[in-house]
Amino acid sequence: MKTTQFILASASPARRRLLQTVGIEPIVSPSDFDESQIEETEPGKLVQILAQCKAETVAPQFPSGLVMGCDSVLAIDGKIHGKPIDADEAIARWQLMRGQVGDLYTGHVLIDNLQNRTLVKCQVTRVYFANISDRTIQAYVATGEPLKCAGAFALEGFGSLFIEKIAGCHSNVIGLSLPLLRQMLEELNYDVTDFWK
C-alpha cells in the first residue's frame, strides 16, 4: 500500500519552495520539537537526530502519510553553527566565515506510516565563502536574511553574492537535497512522480 500524502515537518519556506519546484505540493506541518534538548557535537549525527525528532513529532498526526523532517547546520573547523540568534551574532559569524570553507550538513528523514518504515540520511555540501568587508557584512545582516538560515546565509537570496562556489548538492545548501529525496523515495518503493500534483 502506498500514500500520495507528502507532509513537510518544517516551517522553512525554502524547503517548501524546493519541493514545489519539482512538483510536490507538501502539507506543511511544522514540528514544535525543542532542539535545545539534543546535545550532539558531531554535525552529521546532530542533523539526523534533529530531523528524525521533528518528523517523529509530526508523524502521528498523519497515519497514512509520508512525513519528511529536515535539519541543517554549517560546520567550520569542526564547530557547529545553526541559525544566529540576533544581528550581532550574525555579524560575528560572517566575520568568522569570510574567506573560509565550511560544510553544510542536512539531515533528511522520511517516515512512511503506511509501510511502517523510516529512512535517515545526511547530505554534506562544501561551501566556499567570499572574503567580504565589514561594511558588506553589516549591510547583508541588515537585510534580515542571515537571521533566518542555518549558517547565516541563504544561497537562494542575497547570500548568493557572497559564496564563491559550492562543491556538492546545490539544493542541499538551500534546505534539502532533491537528488537524495528522490533516492530515498525509491528506497521506499515510490517514484517521485507519485507525488506530483
Swiss-Prot record:
Swiss-Prot/TrEMBL cofactor(s): a divalent metal cation
Top-level class of the enzyme under EC nomenclature: hydrolase
Reactions that this protein is recorded to catalyse: a ribonucleoside 5'-triphosphate + H2O = a ribonucleoside 5'-phosphate + diphosphate + H(+); a 2'-deoxyribonucleoside 5'-triphosphate + H2O = a 2'-deoxyribonucleoside 5'-phosphate + diphosphate + H(+)
Entries under InterPro entries matching the protein: ITPase-like_fam, Maf-like
GO MF assignments: nucleoside triphosphate diphosphatase activity
Classification via CDD domains: Maf
Principal location listed in the UniProt entry: cytoplasm
EC annotation from Swiss-Prot or TrEMBL: 3.6.1.9
Active-site residues annotated for this sequence: D71 (proton acceptor)
Keywords annotated in UniProt: Cytoplasm, Hydrolase, Nucleotide metabolism
Xref: Pfam families: Maf (PF02545)
Subcellular localization, as worded in the UniProt entry: Cytoplasm
Signal sequence, renumbered to the chain: none
Superkingdom to which the source organism belongs: Bacteria
GO terms for cellular component: cytoplasm
GO biological process, one term: nucleotide metabolic process
Keyword Cytoplasm attached: yes
NCBIfam families, per database record: maf (TIGR00172)
Function description: Nucleoside triphosphate pyrophosphatase. May have a dual role in cell division arrest and in preventing the incorporation of modified nucleotides into cellular nucleic acids.
HAMAP family: Maf
Family from the record: Belongs to the Maf family.
Protein name: Nucleoside triphosphate pyrophosphatase
